């Protein structure tokens, strides 16, 4: 059969495999490229090529990640797989690989293990919105009741971390059998069922331009006779001339009107996600606005000082600290375009945090920052990055 033309017109969805070491994440990743490649074209990848993932540096943090892609009937999937547990932690916290949904791989022969739990918790903390489960190695379990028991355990574990355990699709199969071309229920057809579950359970992601307008302020200029211009890159949404917007963060929120949008010295009617623009603001003085604030549509983002965060602390080899830090540690938190000092409160029972650790902490900033859950930040000491984090929950 001739391979169909590789289509780029399908909607693009980002997914990735998570789960305990040796439960078959990489084998399943290979199976997805092989089985879907037969149906829709695209590159098939074998286990070895995925397992030898290249090292990448994201914000100074070394992460090994394999990127593969495959098609379904209706979608194009970009899929990430990490060789080691530490790579998952770093990947999810830095948002190097944003996931619209995750495939939790759990060995039916072993059931949920410590990293199964940890990856579900991480998914909750960093805002992975959907999880689909693949119970792998089903060929190694003869007892039907045992399979049902493992499925029940996984569903309960998902419930524990506020994922809808009862409604989550759970697919039984064997990634290895699928790669071998096995046509029984647990072979190739199980991969088809998994992809169907991804198609139906993970909604199409909202395009950046369809989200509310937000632009971090990078620089401010005064133009004689015209007013004040704030420049930056539009993060999400669309801004149009004549709209009322808010200036949020660091100081009390103020409202202003957009009187012009320009890009490369040309006047535009609007600026949209990804554009580097200057926004002319009516009645706003140069001293009313500063770097680190954001421009946003009214009521879409609020300033906060206190939040729960999931943090990865750089190891010494990554250029991080050489020593641990303790309760009350006060570094700078770099949000979008600026540093704000904050105090760290460690969880009960945690005496200290070592370089290379990941930790949940509560942070209180000295100035409010415009934030939503899921916002990424860097932790810095004197301009040097020593950690990366994500806002897991806003407290105040």
From Swiss-Prot:
Matching InterPro entries: EF-Tu_GTP-bd, EF-Tu_GTPase, EFTu-like_2, EFTU_2, G_TR_CS, P-loop_NTPase, Small_GTP-bd, T_Tr_GTP-bd_dom
Domain tr-type G: 10-206
Highest taxon in the source lineage: Bacteria
UniProt keyword list: Cytoplasm, Elongation factor, GTP-binding, Hydrolase, Magnesium, Metal-binding, Nucleotide-binding, Protein biosynthesis
Region (G2): 60-64
Role summary: GTP hydrolase that promotes the GTP-dependent binding of aminoacyl-tRNA to the A-site of ribosomes during protein biosynthesis.
HAMAP family the UniProt entry points to: EF_Tu_B (MF_00118_B)
Protein name (record): Elongation factor Tu
Protein's gene: tuf1
């Amino acid at each position: 059969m001739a391979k169909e033309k590789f289509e780029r017109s399908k909607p693009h969805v980002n997914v990735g495999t998570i789960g305990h070491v040796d439960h078959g994440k990489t084998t399943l990743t290979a199976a997805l490229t092989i089985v879907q490649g037969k149906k829709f074209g695209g590159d098939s990848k074998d286990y070895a090529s995925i397992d030898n993932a290249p090292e990448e540096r994201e914000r100074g943090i070394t992460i090994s990640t394999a990127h593969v892609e495959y098609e379904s009937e209706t979608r194009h999937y970009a899929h990430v797989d990490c060789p080691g547990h530490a790579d998952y932690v770093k990947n999810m916290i830095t948002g190097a690989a944003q996931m619209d949904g995750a495939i939790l791989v759990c060995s039916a022969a072993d059931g949920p293990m410590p990293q199964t739990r940890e990856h579900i918790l991480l998914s909750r903390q960093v805002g992975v919105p959907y999880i689909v489960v693949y119970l792998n190695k089903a060929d190694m379990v003869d007892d039907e009741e045992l399979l049902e028991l493992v499925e029940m355990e996984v569903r309960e574990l998902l419930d524990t971390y506020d994922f809808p355990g009862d409604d989550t699709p759970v697919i039984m199969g064997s990634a290895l059998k699928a790669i071998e071309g096995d046509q029984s229920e647990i072979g190739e057809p199980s991969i088809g069922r998994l992809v169907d579950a991804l198609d139906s359970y993970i909604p199409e992601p909202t395009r950046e331009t369809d989200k509310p307008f937000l632009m971090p302020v990078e620089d401010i200029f005064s133009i004689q006779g015209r007013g004040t211009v704030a420049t930056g890159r539009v993060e999400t949404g669309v801004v149009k001339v004549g709209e009322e917007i808010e200036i949020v963060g660091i100081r009390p929120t103020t409202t202003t009107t957009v009187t012009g949008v320009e890009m490369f010295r040309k006047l535009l009617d609007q600026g949209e996600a990804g554009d580097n623009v200057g926004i002319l603001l009516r009645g706003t003085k140069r001293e009313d606005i500063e770097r680190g604030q954001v421009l946003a549509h009214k009521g879409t983002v609020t300033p906060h000082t206190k939040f729960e965060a999931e943090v990865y602390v750089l190891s010494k080899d990554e250029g991080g600290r050489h020593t641990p830090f303790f309760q009350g540690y006060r570094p700078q938190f770099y949000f979008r375009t600026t540093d704000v000092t904050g105090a760290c409160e460690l969880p009960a029972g945690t005496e200290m945090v070592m370089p290379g650790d990941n930790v949940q902490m509560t942070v209180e900033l000295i100035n409010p920052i415009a934030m939503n859950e899921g916002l990424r930040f860097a932790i810095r000491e004197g301009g040097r990055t020593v950690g990366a984090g994500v806002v897991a929950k806003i407290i105040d």
